[in-house]
C-alpha cells in the first residue's frame, strides 16, 4: 500500500461537477494506492502512519488535533515507467480487491478519531488542493 500525504489548507474532489468530498481548514489529502498483496496489516499500518505523522503546524499529528482527511484512491501510484514511455499499472490491485481496502483505510482513520471524506472509487475525479508548506510525504506499508 502506498500513500501520498499532503498537508493542505483545503481540498476537494469533484465528479461530474458535483463535490463528493472536501476538507476545509488545516488537514490532510491522502492519495492511496493498493497493490496485490495488501491486506488488513497494511490497512492498519498506513492508517496509523497517516494519523500519527507529525506534519501539521506545531509538529502535531492529525490524531492530536482531529484534523480532517480527504482520502482519494489512486491506482496510478503503482505505475511502472521503467520501459518505454507508456506506464503500466500491473502492480496496482484490481478494483474488486482495492475498493474494500480503501474503504477499510477510511474506517481505520475514523477509528483514530479523524473526520474522513473520500473521493468516489473508480470515478474520473478532479482533485483540487492548496498544499500548505508545501508538505508532501510518501508512505509505503
UniProtKB/Swiss-Prot annotation:
UniProt comment concerning the protein's domains: A Gly-cisPro motif from one monomer fits into the active site of the other monomer to allow specific chiral rejection of L-amino acids.
Family: Belongs to the DTD family.
Record note on quaternary structure: Homodimer.
Role noted for this protein: An aminoacyl-tRNA editing enzyme that deacylates mischarged D-aminoacyl-tRNAs. Also deacylates mischarged glycyl-tRNA(Ala), protecting cells against glycine mischarging by AlaRS. Acts via tRNA-based rather than protein-based catalysis; rejects L-amino acids rather than detecting D-amino acids in the active site. By recycling D-aminoacyl-tRNA to D-amino acids and free tRNA molecules, this enzyme counteracts the toxicity associated with the formation of D-aminoacyl-tRNA entities in vivo and helps enforce protein L-homochirality.
Protein name: D-aminoacyl-tRNA deacylase
Gene Ontology biological-process entries: D-amino acid catabolic process
GO molecular function: D-tyrosyl-tRNA(Tyr) deacylase activity; Gly-tRNA(Ala) deacylase activity; Ser(Gly)-tRNA(Ala) hydrolase activity; tRNA binding
Gene: dtd
Keyword Iron-sulfur in record: no
Amino acid at each position: 500500500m502506498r500513500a501520498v500525504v499532503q498537508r493542505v489548507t483545503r481540498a476537494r474532489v469533484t465528479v461530474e461537477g458535483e463535490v463528493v468530498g472536501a476538507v476545509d481548514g488545516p488537514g490532510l489529502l491522502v492519495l492511496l494506492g493498493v497493490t496485490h498483496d495488501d491486506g488488513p496489516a497494511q490497512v492498519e499500518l498506513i492508517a496509523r502512519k497517516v494519523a500519527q505523522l507529525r506534519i501539521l503546524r506545531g509538529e502535531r499529528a492529525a490524531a492530536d488535533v482531529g484534523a480532517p482527511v480527504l482520502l482519494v484512491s489512486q491506482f496510478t501510484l503503482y505505475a511502472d515507467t521503467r520501459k518505454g514511455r507508456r506506464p503500466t499499472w500491473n502492480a496496482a490491485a484490481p478494483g474488486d480487491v482495492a475498493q474494500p481496502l480503501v474503504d477499510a483505510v477510511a474506517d481505520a482513520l475514523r477509528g483514530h478519531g479523524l473526520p474522513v471524506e473520500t473521493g468516489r472509487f473508480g470515478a474520473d475525479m478532479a482533485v483540487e488542493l492548496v498544499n500548505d508548506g508545501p508538505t508532501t510525504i510518501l508512505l509505503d506499508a
